[in-house]
C-alpha cells in the first residue's frame, strides 16, 4: 500500500527536479528586459565593491601597458600618438561595456534564483503530503536493507562527499554555484570553502554515527568501521 502511494507521488518528485530549470529559463527571458532598463537608469548609483573595482583597474592597466608597449616599438610620431589615444578610447569603452554586462548578469541570475527559491518553497509546502508519503516509503526501504548494505552505502556516500578525492568535486560544485549566480570566481574563497566545508561535514557525519547509529544499530557501526579500515 505504501509502495503504491509512493509511486503515486513520483510525478510530484519528478516535477521538483525539472521545476528549477523551467523557472530559471522562463524568468530569465521575462526579467531580462526589465533588468536592462533598470540597470541603464540606476547603474550610476550602484558603487563597485573592492574586488570589482580592483578587477577593473587591473584590466585597464594591462590594456594601457599593451598599447604603450606596442607604440614603443614604433616611432613616436604625431599620427602614432593619435592612434594610441583612439585605440585606448575604444578599448576603454569595450571594457566598460563588458563590466556592465557582468553586473547585469549578476543581477539577473540573483533575481531569478530568489524567485526560483520562493516558488520551490511554496511547492514543497503545498506538496507536504506527497513528501511525507515518499519519506515513509524510503525509511521502510532502508530499514529492510541488511546492515552490510547500509554500511556500504554510508561509506560510499561519505567517500564521495568528504573523502580524500572529493576536493575536485567540491571545486566544480562551488564554481557552478558562482556561475549560476553570475559571479566572477574567486580562487581564494573557493579554496577556503573546499578546505573547510568537507571537514565540517565529516565531523557532523562522525557525530551522527556515534550518537544515532551506535544507539539504533551497534552491529551496523561495527561493520562500518570494519569496512572503513
Swiss-Prot record:
GO cellular component: chloroplast inner membrane
Localization in the cell: Plastid, Chloroplast inner membrane
Protein encoded by which gene: cemA
Single Gene Ontology MF annotation: proton transmembrane transporter activity
Organism: Phalaenopsis aphrodite subsp. formosana
Catalytic activity entry: K(+)(in) + H(+)(out) = K(+)(out) + H(+)(in)
Name of this chain's protein: Potassium/proton antiporter CemA
Function, as annotated: Contributes to K(+)/H(+) antiport activity by supporting proton efflux to control proton extrusion and homeostasis in chloroplasts in a light-dependent manner to modulate photosynthesis. Prevents excessive induction of non-photochemical quenching (NPQ) under continuous-light conditions. Indirectly promotes efficient inorganic carbon uptake into chloroplasts.
Topological category with respect to the lipid bilayer: Multi-pass membrane protein
Residue runs in coiled coils: none
Any Gene Ontology biological process: potassium ion transport
Primary location group: plastid
Pfam families xrefs: CemA
Family membership noted in the UniProt record: Belongs to the CemA family.
Superkingdom per UniProt: Eukaryota
Record's keyword terms, sorted: Antiport, Chloroplast, Hydrogen ion transport, Ion transport, Membrane, Plastid, Plastid inner membrane, Potassium, Potassium transport, Transmembrane, Transmembrane helix, Transport
InterPro entries: CemA
Bilayer-spanning residue ranges: 7-27, 106-126, 154-174, 189-209
